[in-house]
Amino acid sequence: MKDLLNLFNQQRQTLDFDAIKIGLASPALIRSWSFGEVKKPETINYRTFKPERDGLFCAAIFGPIKDYECLCGKYKRMKHRGVVCEKCGTEVTLAKVRRERMGSIELASPVAHIWFLKSLPSRIGLMLDMTLRDIERVLYFEAYVVTEPGLTPLERRQLLTEEQYLQARQEHADDFDATMGAEAVYELLRMIDLQSEMARLREEIVVTGSETKLKRLTKRIKLIEAFIESGNRPEWMILTVLPVLPPDLRPLVPLDGGRFATSDLNDLYRRVINRNNRLCRLLELSAPDIIVRNEKRMLQESVDALLDNGRRGRAITGTNKRPLKSLADMIKGKQGRFRQNLLGKRVDYSARSVIIVGPNLRLHQCGLPKKMALELFKPFVFAKLQRRGLATTIKAAKKLVEREEAEVWDILEEVISEHPVVLNRAPTLHRQGIQAFEPVLIEGKAIQLHPLVCTAFNADFDGDQMAVHVPLSLEAQLEARALMMSTNNILSPANGEPIIVPSQDVVLGLYYMSRALENKKGEGMVFANTSELKRAYDNSVVELHAKVKVRITEIETDDRGLRSKASLIVDTTVGRALLSEILPEGLPFVLVNTEMTKKNISRLINSSYRMLGLKDTVVFADKLMYTGYAYATRAGVSICIDDMLIPIEKKEILGEAEQEVLEIQEQYQSGLVTAGERYNKVVDIWSRTNERIAKAMMDTIGTEKVVNTDGEIVDQKSMNSLYIMADSGARGSPQQIRQLAAMRGLMVRPDGSIIETPIKANFREGLSVQEYFNSTHGARKGLADTALKTANSGYLTRRLVDVTQDLCVVQLDCGTAGGLTMTPIVEGGDVVEPLKDRVLGRVVAEDVFLPGNDDEPIVTRSTLLDEQWVAKLEEAGVQSVKVRSPITCESPFGVCALCYGRDLARGHLVNMGEAVGVIAAQSIGEPGTQLTMRTFHIGGTALSAAAVDNITVKTSGSVKFTNLKYVEHVNGTLVAVSRSGEISVLDTHGRERERYKLPYGATINVKDMAEVKSGQILANWDPHNHPIVSEVAGFVRFIDFVDGVTVIEKTDDLTGLSSREIADLKRRGSQGKDLRPLVRIVDKKGNDLTIPGTDLSAQYLLPPRSIVNLQDGAPVGIGDVVAKIPQEASKTRDITGGLPRVADLFEARRPKDPAILAERSGVISFGKDTKGKQRLIIKDADGSEHEELIPKYRQIIVFEGEHVTKGETIVDGEPSPQDILRLLGIEPLAAYLVKEIQDVYRLQGVKINDKHIEVITRQMLRKVEIVDQGNSKFLNGEQVERQRVIDENAKLIARNELPAKYNPVLLGITKASLATESFISAASFQETTRVLTEAAVRGTRDNLRGLKENVIVGRLIPAGTGQRYHSQRRYSSVGLTQSEMETLVGRSTSSGTEVTSPSKDAIPLGG
């Protein structure tokens, strides 16, 4: 018996391994795999259905068809195990060996492996230093190649045509060898001596001068080095023996009706065997050369088709005209082995059904239909029935269950109690799409889902379906309960805000009960406590919305954590007081003593979680939901057409707008405005009008006049059903109500431009035919967009997951001093994101001091900033904090807990092993479908605002200038002459309240540090023109002004004033080519003046289309406008918005016309122009010059004599992220990416924490480029994983040798995923063939560090609970005990860093 058990065990064992290596298979290796040679193309005998001997399904080679039974039936049963039948040659063993035993085909002539030939760059070509075309001509028998020149003048690897070959044979007889076909290539590859070739190339690379040659040599050196290191031989890229896949992996299945379904591979193998056998015969018969050659070529083609059909020439098709699936097709693409069977598998013990709402469930429960539960938990029920003695065998138990006896249901109840199930809704865009619940048995066939988790699943009840899975093992159940339970997923991992938030009906009910109305029954009554009030309400003494006074008892917690009771009488309403009854102890009544809109409810749940913890919050959320439903039912809110009130002012406002449009039309016809300006102005007018009508409508709907208790008529918020729904955040938005009751507004054409005639009607009035067609235009575009968006968004998520999948938290502290400096984000003067939101949950990198006081730090280094710390920082008026960031983390693989900071979904420091990469990818990808696909024209979008032309202060305080260069005008105002200047407004504590960018040429009405009042105008400028300002006083001198050539004189009809416009380059003709019109400022005697602080003369180059209003010789003062450039033209640039913009940023694509940044700091001057380019020179402090040639059509935004700093924009445009990295470094790049990506999401109202974007940026910066190889083995210009260079340099420094120098490189997410160290992960992402070819040549070893690789090889992932398993495996193989291991892994904090946090629950370190 013992032997029998051992026998079963030895077949179950799996290999334990730490890495996977891939390489080229030598012919000897292929033969060692083989269990016999396949000699015939036959598959099975059509009469007996038994495999043919020596055929593709031969039992003698591949093993028996039935377990322990030979083919002829002589040996049966297990007792003959291992016997080889002498009659049919089959070994008696398990049939499943037919899945693992390989065969082989001995090829009559060598054949090139198509992957190493055609997968670019061609490895065979690189190895032989021949072009792919030449090698193909040799392989496919079109040319000879010299393999051994002997003493003849021919050269090795020289190609000869048929004629040249015959001529050479006549001249030199047998002194040389030249052949064609794969034999020739095989010979050439076999002759290569890798070591000496390597030495020769290394010598050559030093002396070579040409750039292209250098590239080619570097590639060859890398390739040959790879061959030497991996132990591969070049001639193995040519096949002399072909392996045959085990037959059960290319099955032949009988269908009913006597036909067979077969795998395409069998057809492909059959062709190879047929041609190979035919070739053998021809060679035996020594047939004419031309026939043999043709047969060899056909053999080569059939092997090509088997390995990768369609890679060369036309794909071989089967009977039904579709290309046959070759071995390469089996592994690549969505249906390939990687993505279909290894990364995504079907799961047993699962069910799916429609979902319905379960308003009486608790948060941790879901309703499971009885039938479904019985099917899912069948094995458990069988076992219990047997254990109870209700059934003797499994069969009997099965009968009981099928009859659905009464006791079965009782046992099912017991089985499912405390056994969580996992619910999943597709598409699973983030980890909240799979959560665990405790099942409750229900009648019917639909699954009941708790309403509060709908947001997380993005589920609604209009026919959505969900899948149920049963965690079977104890560990799985434990993880489902501890980590995946819906009650543990209250906060969203994307932004740390509650995701379990009531919506729709619940919000409506809570909002309805918390509204206060004037003059309701019982107003002014005073109650001793809430229960007294409840009695009064139940007896209809007071109404729900009446304003009353109630005594509330609260429990307060002081700083030391002591709790005390406090009573206070509050002004509130009946509804709010009733709501306070469900408040958990410890939450202040203030939180519900307000209108419970969706925002406030979210804030309430958030406060509850932070103050009271998880358990109380879950119970509270449930109570809120029940209450909300109850009062929504009582409210009985419904909408009807009378709720859509059209404002009386609408007619009047429309009349005014139409009048304005007419005026502009007249101006256009008399030529005062251009077509573009007219369009922009009309769109502007209608946008403004729409806003005005919408505001009037919201005022009409949202307020009503009522009589209060004193008999006065007052305004109060109305109880209009439509308004209630929008105001509470339950359903609908002002945008939608505006279309129902105000006006539909401007519509968008499919290309994103705006139709200038708006829809003046609303849906209540109804649209006219023309209006209806205008509106269908935009609506159809919307639907088409949605379909595209879903696919694009899914693909973005896939790329993001792929690039970050191997990033986990690996240690507590990497000990780095680096970090990013965080400041509030200000746009258009408003603080869009205050500092507190940006630093919350981050770890401080440097001590933070009070502004202007460097003695006592407020917050010390390595403190995790939680809500209390952030409040302290805000109180102190701190404006910038340096925090640790994943980008600057120095952990070798992964990130450390302190650089990452708080786990947003849990609210404490992140645990060891958390897969922060995948979380980041999901958080960014999940809202992808909410983003638009639009490109915006800055002409004004359907929601455009009018152009800004001044800065008006919103808060009182003092003014502070930063980076601002200005000159003082004669009249005392200041004129800005810098581009990056900013004005901030500080409050009394020195905290920045507003910040504005100042354009060049703006007039500033205040001095630095002056006091300002709110509403005061600080600065103004002309939004439609870009001025050129003189920095010195003197007289104007025109240079190169030639009438009719470089300038066009224009006289204004109305005013009679003349101005000169600089002519466009195209209009100048030949004599104006080299003229450069400029204005120079001179003194009385006509000598050039210089710009203060430089030795450059004060002259201003005038770009085309600029307008000069001065006359030659006119006096100018400091700060006067010399010329102005109309802004109209440069503004039509499209802004890519939405999803495409996010994808462009993550792919690190260069914009079309990128901004040109200053390569160094210095003073600007202009040199001689070339044909289509302008020459701009930057002269730095030590006098060296840098030249930049800029196309004439680009707008240079700097002037002669201006001082620029390195990395500043000198030519307008979108900056390229690569330039920012190169000139400014990693921190500004990170800031740029975070800002740009956040702008897109913020526009859609999506909140994502910065750290997710930083995590992805870290992965984009994984590689570095070697600038100077030093004594390392890297090559100049090579891109290497940063960690490899750091390790290599450490070794070099230890040996006192020169380390390699390198620069960081920014890779797009697709490139970064393919350039990962793991070839398994890269191959399963994209370009499978290329990745595997490259890896095989290099003999790459995959250390299985990431998540994907481990899923593919079928192990636990090295993240979360799997991380302990992996570290235990690693240490037990070295022979360490558990306790030794824990000291190594770092239960203690490493590098002596303490993590401090003032919250009452301490942070669990190390998980």
Curated annotation (Swiss-Prot):
GO MF: DNA binding; DNA-directed RNA polymerase activity; magnesium ion binding; zinc ion binding
Entry-linked SMART domains: RPOLA_N
Region spans: Disordered: 1384-1407
UniProt cross-references to Gene3D superfamilies, sorted A to Z: 1.10.132.30, 1.10.150.390, 1.10.1790.20, 1.10.40.90, 2.40.40.20, 2.40.50.100, RNA polymerase II, clamp domain (4.10.860.120), RNA polymerase Rpb1, domain 3 (1.10.274.100)
Cofactor: Mg(2+); Zn(2+)
GO CC aspect terms: DNA-directed RNA polymerase complex
Catalytic activity: RNA(n) + a ribonucleoside 5'-triphosphate = RNA(n+1) + diphosphate
Free-text comment on the cofactor: Binds 1 Mg(2+) ion per subunit.
Binding locations of Zn(2+) 2: C814, C889, C896, C899
InterPro entries: DNA-dir_RpoC_beta_prime (IPR045867), DNA-dir_RpoC_beta_prime_bact (IPR012754), RNA_pol_asu (IPR000722), RNA_pol_N (IPR006592), RNA_pol_Rpb1_1 (IPR007080), RNA_pol_Rpb1_3 (IPR007066), RNA_pol_Rpb1_3_sf (IPR042102), RNA_pol_Rpb1_4 (IPR007083)
Residues binding Zn(2+) 1, per UniProt: C70, C72, C85, C88
EC number of the protein: 2.7.7.6
Keywords carried by this UniProt record: DNA-directed RNA polymerase, Magnesium, Metal-binding, Nucleotidyltransferase, Transcription, Transferase, Zinc
Chain positions recorded as Mg(2+) binding sites: D460, D462, D464
One GO-annotated biological process of the protein: DNA-templated transcription
Entries under NCBIfam families matching the protein: rpoC_TIGR (TIGR02386)
HAMAP family: RNApol_bact_RpoC (MF_01322)
Oligomeric and partner information: The RNAP catalytic core consists of 2 alpha, 1 beta, 1 beta' and 1 omega subunit. When a sigma factor is associated with the core the holoenzyme is formed, which can initiate transcription.
Task performed by this protein: DNA-dependent RNA polymerase catalyzes the transcription of DNA into RNA using the four ribonucleoside triphosphates as substrates.
Family: Belongs to the RNA polymerase beta' chain family.
Protein name: DNA-directed RNA polymerase subunit beta'
